[in-house]
């Protein structure tokens, strides 16, 4: 039995209460989705084509964190690969170098889903976020903190804001699909559409030259391997307090504070987020902004 769905629901409830207390004191379609389905034969294994053609990912970071150099470049490539591979439930949409940089999903709490669930995984339905209909809009990621050094490794905390994305319905309208964790449609609380990840990285040894700088451009995805020998060791989306017998690297109190930070730093106020995640909308309500900082186009 995969504990992720149970713990996600339990810890989400606990952390939401913790966030409320902190405030007072201081991105899967549901199983059985009936939207229009694209044939797998019509989707080429190319990022940001087909079902993801009208979605883009935009990044921001706290002051002092350079999104254009490692290790932030590695974090960007990892998270974007995770999002695309998870939405399409296929490893064919990972960026070049992902397979070598990211270990397979394991059996420990810290690595149960270091990779997204894909077709063939037993828990794709209850823990994945595959879309079978076009997804549109702007998915935002934000590096909240980045600590460490090349010798001991780095730890990043990343906010994921997917509330401004939506999937197409049979009637041509769009709605937010309430993924991660699965929620009843039209759920709208302060954390709906907001995720949090704690990612551990290891630099290559011996050090390799960084990818050609700067890692910015007009392309939504890289055409070459930008992982540069870096390894993604762990990627947690829940407090580690639940994993008995494993290091408690992300205690519940710290996890709740980080969730509050991701909530308060979201680009849109709660009322705007509530608008995005409830009801049916026209396509224009979910604008597709250009990728930022993007990646160098092929041949540049």
Language-model segments: which ranges?
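C-terminal motif of bacterial Sec signal peptides marking the signal peptidase cleavage site
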Residues: 23-26
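Structured, amphipathic secondary-structure segments that form assembly/contact surfaces
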Residues: 91-194, 202-204, 209-213
């Amino acid at each position: 039995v995969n504990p992720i769905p149970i713990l996600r629901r339990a810890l989400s409830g606990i952390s939401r209460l913790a966030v409320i207390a902190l405030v007072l004191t201081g991105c899967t379609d549901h199983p059985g989705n009936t939207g229009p389905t694209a044939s797998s034969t019509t989707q080429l294994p190319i990022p940001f084509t087909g079902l993801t053609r009208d979605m883009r990912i935009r990044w921001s970071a706290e002051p002092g964190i350079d999104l254009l150099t490692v290790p932030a470049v590695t974090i960007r490539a990892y998270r974007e690969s995770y999002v695309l591979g998870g939405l399409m439930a296929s490893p064919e949409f990972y960026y070049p170098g992902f397979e070598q940089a990211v270990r397979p999903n394991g059996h420990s709490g810290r690595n149960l889903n270091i990779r997204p669930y894909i077709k063939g995984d037993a828990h794709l339905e209850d823990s994945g976020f595959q879309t079978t209909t076009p997804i549109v809009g702007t998915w935002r990621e934000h590096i909240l903190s980045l600590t460490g050094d090349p010798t001991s490794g780095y730890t990043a905390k990343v906010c994921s804001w997917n509330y401004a994305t939506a999937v197409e319905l049979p009637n041509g309208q769009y709605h937010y699909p309430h993924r991660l964790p699965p929620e009843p449609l039209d759920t709208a609380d302060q954390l709906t559409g907001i995720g949090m990840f704690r990612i551990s990285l290891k630099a290559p040894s011996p050090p390799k030259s960084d990818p050609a700088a700067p890692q910015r451009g007009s392309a939504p995805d890289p055409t070459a391997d930008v992982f540069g020998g870096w390894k993604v060791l762990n990627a947690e989306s829940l407090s580690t307090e639940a994993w008995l017998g494993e290091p408690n690297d992300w205690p519940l109190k710290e996890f709740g504070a980080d969730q509050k930070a991701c909530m308060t730093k979201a680009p849109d106020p709660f009322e705007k987020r509530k608008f995005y995640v409830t009801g049916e909308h026209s396509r224009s309500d979910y604008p597709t902004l250009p990728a930022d900082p993007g990646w160098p186009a092929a041949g540049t």
